[in-house]
Amino acid sequence: HVNASGMVNYKDFLKDKAELDTYLKTLSDNPPQPSWTSNEQKAYWINAYNAFTVSLILMHYPVKSIKDIAGKIYKINTAWDIQFINIGGKKYDLNNIEHGMLRRKFNDPRIHFAIVCASMSCAKLRREAYLPAKLDAQLDEAGKDFLNDKPKNRISGGKAKRRERGAG
């Protein structure tokens, strides 16, 4: 339910929500292990982040913006702070995965181009999972795609301008 431009058709995704739920359960029941390689762990967390982001939108569908979700939940500042993710018996929110697991543990700036925040300003959702064996190539490609996306990155008067996260 992702087109070639990385746009997600959430309405159609709802029809196959059972498949997504099965995938999320597989992720939840099989957390990364210390014996896994760095690329195996990184791919796992990127895929988990993206799948749970789609799931969050579907839980609140129809929703105009991911930013509208947090306002529905008492004492939650943003959608990224909702602890709805269970991995290996531990609760996470999207911020935990993005900042606590991905950015802190792997220190790879290309992660920014791989994780989706369900808005026009963010990286596009790939039509395939991130795989350990080709993760570096996938991350490089995601970075090139993002940086070459003119609506997301504009240079005006010699200054770079980016859309804000969660914008449009």
Locate each region found by the language model.
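Interaction/scaffold regions that mediate signaling and macromolecular assembly across diverse proteins
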Residues: H1-G168
